[in-house]
């Protein structure tokens, strides 16, 4: 649990992860927490059961399930104009970084949609791919 993040109702979707502190561009915000799951079949089975996807793939056979033992970062919503991004870091971990300066009270967002597999997006960003 971070003292710099909180979870509350989001205007994008359900609940969101919000900054309680100022984050400067490229600063690490937090680690994405959860249970490390190994085995693509096991991961796929979890994906089918989850209403809101909280699984982040590390490689083709390993993922982190933020629905089990996760923290506030499991509630980061998608935006076509994100303010943060994820990077895999050593030790089967995923870190969240600020893409630009983020103010306290601002919702953290990441572009986690696959451009090769378009789907309807309702993120509300001015440059949302569904508006094109």
Label every PLM stretch briefly.
Residues 1-86:
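Catalytic cores of histone-lysine modification enzymes
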Residues 18, 52, 80-132:
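C-terminal SET catalytic tail plus cysteine-rich post-SET Zn-binding segment of SAM-dependent SET-domain
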């Amino acid at each position: 649990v971070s003292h710099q993040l909180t979870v509350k109702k989001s205007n994008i979707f359900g609940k969101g992860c919000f900054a309680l502190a100022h984050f400067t561009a490229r600063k690490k915000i937090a680690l994405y927490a959860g249970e490390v799951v190994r085995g693509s079949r096991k991961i796929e089975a979890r994906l089918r059961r989850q209403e809101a996807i909280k699984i982040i793939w590390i490689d083709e056979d390993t993922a982190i399930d933020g629905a089990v033992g996760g923290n506030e970062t499991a509630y980061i919503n998608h935006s076509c104009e994100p303010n943060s991004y994820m990077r895999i870091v050593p030790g089967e971990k995923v870190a969240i970084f600020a893409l630009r300066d983020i103010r306290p009270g601002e919702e953290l967002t990441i572009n986690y949609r696959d451009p090769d597999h378009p789907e309807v997006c309702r993120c509300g960003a001015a440059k949302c791919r569904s508006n094109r």
